[in-house]
Amino acid sequence: MKKRQNKAKNNLLWQYGLGMTILFVVISASFLYLVFLGMKPYQTAKSEGEKLAQQYTGLEQADQVDLYNGLESYYSVLGRNKQQEALAVLIGKDDHKIYVYQLNQGISQEKAEAVSKEKGAGEIDKITFGRYQDKPIWEVKSGTNFYLVDFETGALVNKEGL
């Protein structure tokens, strides 16, 4: 009788362990699938932006591709053309209007970062090239604040906080 009770107890423990393992696998797979679904639009935007920039502007090498979301949304592509000139290409997400800027004709990312820090930015999270009120800008993200620095003059255009 004791043998039967021990066998039933072991069987119950085995079933419990199997059930917990299956539950863990299902929850982990669901989480990974949701992460994959969340990243898909961003990856699609990056590849589409890079492809359009190479197709219409002669961009040969894309170094940085981002999605800029300001008053309007743009694919922001930084790279080099065949003459190895550094370019910034902005492609309107909705209308696919293309703007091309030579990076040597404005301030650098480092200068935009320095201007933002002068105006109170802490640790810099991300710098994205964009367009605000028909002017090219560097968008510097620091914590919950966004500093918009004019690409041509280096002046702070706007500071936005979340």
Name each model-derived stretch:
Residues 15-33:
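Hydrophobic membrane-insertion alpha-helices, especially the h-region
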Residues 53, 70-96, 110-162:
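Conserved histidines in hydrophobic membrane contexts and catalytic metal-binding motifs
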Residues 29, 33, 92-99:
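Acidic/histidine-rich, surface-exposed loop or edge segments in extracytoplasmic proteins
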